[in-house]
Amino acid sequence: MSYPLSVEKDGIKIKPEQMKPETIYHCIFQNKIFIIYKDHGEILNCYEIEEEEIISKVKASNKENIEKILEEYIEKENLNRQ
């Protein structure tokens, strides 16, 4: 299965049919991180991160570390999924 997010010059293309519920997906577009996930009710949720420190960490990290960085950010900002 391919990654359900792709970045194009016009924006982010999302393929919700490829998303697993409660799984976090991310991409970087226009120097912002977008965190997108589909909840158990099939509703898409999106968060935009503009903090340069987090963006720099994500750009410099591998996949496993990116997930940890984003999970820590979500917890710190109290964006926990319901």
How would you label these PLM feature ranges?
Residues 3, 8-10, 45, 62-65, ...:
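Generic short amphipathic/hydrophobic targeting helices enriched at N-termini
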Residues 16-61:
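Acidic, low-complexity, intrinsically disordered interaction modules
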Residues 1-25:
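Negatively charged, low-complexity tracts enriched in Asp/Glu with abundant Ser/Thr
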Residues 49-82:
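Mixed-charge, Lys/Arg-enriched low-complexity segments
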